[in-house]
From Swiss-Prot:
GO terms for cellular component: mitochondrial outer membrane; pore complex. It comes from Oryza sativa subsp. japonica. It is found in: Mitochondrion outer membrane. PANTHER family: MITOCHONDRIAL OUTER MEMBRANE PROTEIN PORIN 3, VOLTAGE-DEPENDENT ANION-SELECTIVE CHANNEL. This is Mitochondrial outer membrane protein porin 3.
């Protein structure tokens, strides 16, 4: 089985510790037409700011066209072609209007023992990104680099290692030009209840600072999941998510600084409806 892409390394742990948490209020409505067009409208309020987004997606065999407009007058168009000329190869073309320098062409290739991702900006002095993962589903190593052709400098070079078995995933990342080391693990404790625990330790060598975060999740029933996390700075978060119909979810999350409970409590609400 393919090892996946570089962004897949440590993804299970990141989803456990960060996905669906939030202190904002968000409403999302999705509807699908008989012609295969998916329309999604979303509104988000955080503090005093309100952000809106309207997305239209059309799928036709191997071609997907995605057009997204937001309340900041940005228009993002993404065209994706699966199996682009050969099995395992995907091409992605994206452009944000009115930013004329935002165009980007990306190629993704998945092989039994490798996952390659390459992208280049569509402008006169493009940024070139290249990442690769080599190995198997059980053991893989990866690199991720970015080169700025305008300055002829490498702006990013990261490396990662992943170990996976049936219920345990461990990963190690070296980021920020070798300044940040991140170790993480994910353990699926009980399959039938989707009970899992995980942790992430991040250390900055230049600042000599470390951040440690623990998290867990458990399914109360097939439609209801609870999650919790806590870090070494005393920040605690929890959420409950309920799916009352397929892909329609309500999520209530909270965050508190245990060192200043009376001042720091925040509550977020997310409602996703799919028709």
């Amino acid at each position: 089985m393919a090892p996946g892409l570089y962004t897949d390394i440590g993804k299970k742990t990141r989803d456990l510790l960060y996905r669906d948490y939030g202190t904002h209020h968000k409403f999302t409505l999705t509807t699908c037409t008989p012609e295969g067009v998916t329309i999604t409208a979303a509104g988000t309020r955080k503090n005093e700011s309100v952000f809106g987004e309207l997305q239209t997606q059309l799928k036709n065999k191997k071609l997907t066209v995605d057009v997204k407009a937001n309340s900041e007058s940005d228009l993002l168009t993404t065209v994706t072609v699966d199996e682009f000329g050969t099995p395992g190869l995907k091409s992605i073309l994206s452009l944000v209007v009115p930013d004329q320098r935002s165009g980007k062409l990306e190629l993704q290739y998945l092989h039994e023992y490798a996952g390659i991702n390459a992208s280049v900006g569509l402008n006169s002095n493009p940024m070139v990104n290249l990442s690769g993962v080599f190995g198997s589903k059980e053991l893989s190593v990866g690199v991720d680099v970015a080169f700025d052709t305008a300055t002829s400098n490498f702006t990013k070079y990261n490396a990662a290692l992943s170990l996976t078995n049936s219920d345990l995933i461990a990963s190690l990342h070296l980021n920020n030009h070798g300044d940040t080391l991140i170790a993480s693990y994910y353990h699926l404790v009980k399959h039938h209840s989707n009970t899992a625990v995980g942790a992430e330790l991040s250390h900055s060598f230049s600042r000599n600072e470390s951040t440690l975060i623990f998290g867990s999740q458990h399914s109360l029933d097939p439609h209801t999941t609870v999650k919790a996390r806590f870090n070494n700075y005393g920040m605690a978060s929890a959420l409950v998510q309920h799916e009352w119909r397929p892909k329609s979810l309500i999520t209530i999350s909270g965050e508190v600084d245990t060192k200043a409970i009376e001042k720091s409590t925040k509550v977020g609400l997310s409602l996703v409806l799919k028709h």
